[in-house]
Amino acid sequence: VVVDIPKDVSFEKTAYKGYPQSVEMRSYNPVRKGHGGQIRKALQLLLAARRPYIYTGGGVLLADACAELRTLVDLLNCPVTHTLMGLGAFPASDRRFLGMLGMHGTWEANNAMQHCDVLLAVGARFDDRVIGNPKHFAQNERKIIHIDIDPSSISKRVKVDVPIVGDVKDVLSEMIGMIREASARPDQAALADWWKTVEGWRARDCMKYDRANTDVIKPQKVIETLWEMTRGADAYITSDVGQHQMWA
């Protein structure tokens, strides 16, 4: 059981009136299977997209939908990014992974978010570390598809065009089946142009640093050294919360 209390509520003062005699709570029965019509609408947008982009959050991991995500990316051949909580859902070694996005993310991941024409959000909540000021988010015209098991998370911060309420694993499985049965396929020429643009952003190499400067310890150097020391080992690495967590 998780009790989530907003910050403004926790700061308020009130008078204690004792415990209630009884507490009645309605059961939680989430919708697991996505609406077929909404999934078809989403596929129409994705297959017709010239600059598709997949944005995933911790919901993919919680739903054990990593395999389905990888299959979908294979079918669409589009770039994918994660939030902090979604890291690990898609292999970081895959060229289609652009790294984490948001205020602590990569140049290519954030630019792709701002320039895509169809965005598929999967198990993510568009938090402020990702979108910043909602007024300045989605400046370019684009369609947003949002898959989430919690209906209250959809269109909460960013208005979406195709909401799909359901379990991420079930919805992605249904989506994959529909793509395989469909006659339409992504526009490969448009995708090639999109990837050319993405690779231009990636070429900036936003995480690079001056290796010749040994006067200060760079976070990148620390992470690289830690990687070399633990590569191939069955190692567990933990991190405190803060800027160093973002580097880790």
Regions found by a protein language model. Give the residues of each.
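Conformationally flexible catalytic loops at phosphate/diphosphate-handling active centers
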Residues: 1-45, 206
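Short beta-strand segments
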Residues: 2-6, 55, 121-123, 148, ...
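Short internal beta-strands
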Residues: 4, 77-84, 145-148
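Glycine-rich beta-alpha junction loops
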Residues: 5-11, 58-60, 151, 241-243
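Glycine-rich phosphate/diphosphate-binding loops that line cofactor/substrate pockets in enzymes
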Residues: 38-53, 72, 113-115, 225-235
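Glycine-rich phosphate/diphosphate-binding loop of Rossmann-like nucleotide-binding domains
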Residues: 53, 61-74
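Glycine-rich, acidic loop regions that bind phosphate or pyrophosphate groups
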Residues: 86-197
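Active-site diphosphate/adenylate-binding microenvironment
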Residues: 197-248
